[in-house]
Amino acid sequence: RKCFNSPGRLVSKPCPEGNNLCYKMSNRMYPPGFNVRRGCAETCPRRNRLLEVVCCCDTDNCNK
């Protein structure tokens, strides 16, 4: 699997073995594009804050 894994400029990198999901985490308090985290995961991460949005997907570079 390959996922985007940078907060700013979109850079796609291969995921470590066993990490078959891509995720994107953002916060509704910030304008779109700010405070975004992307990466690979074994399971879909849980949100840490009330206004946090987590999206998970299972195809290459799906976390744009």
From Swiss-Prot:
The keyword Disulfide bond applies. One of its GO terms (cellular component) is extracellular region. SUPFAM superfamilies: Snake toxin-like. Its main location: secreted. GO terms for molecular function: toxin activity. Expressed by the venom gland. It comes from the Eukaryota. InterPro entries: Cytotoxin_Cobra, Snake_3FTx, Snake_toxin-like_sf, Snake_toxin_con_site, Toxin_cobra-type. Is classified as a P-type cytotoxin, since a proline residue stands at position 31 (Pro-31 in standard classification). Belongs to the three-finger toxin family. Short-chain subfamily. Orphan group XIII sub-subfamily. This is Cytotoxin homolog S4C8. It comes from Aspidelaps scutatus.
